[in-house]
Amino acid sequence: MEKHLITNDRVRHVPRQFSWVDHRLVRGNYLMKASAPAWALYLVLVTVGDEQGLSYYADRTLARLLSLHEESITEARRQLIEAGVIAYEAPLYQVLGLEPGGFERVEEVAS
């Protein structure tokens, strides 16, 4: 398929304060290691983190931003830690660099 712009007046440009989501989340099967709410939390952490992936948002704030209960933030954080994509030392989060190999494909998504 040949790609083309669908909407010319809204082309993305790299902003001065820039963060990225590593394509290895998909290609390395990381997405299968956590639930959708966990990946929503990850997206917020990637977006608000500094150049080293560090941020310190309170669970209450994260829950409000994501329309989740604080208990859901706790579970989402646990899943992301288990998936090896973040580290947490209250109140500090660190989005980690992804391992080159990723994971083998699994059948069941974490709940």
Indicate residue ranges for each PLM-predicted region.
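Short recognition helix of helix-turn-helix/winged-helix DNA-binding domains
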Residues: 1-53
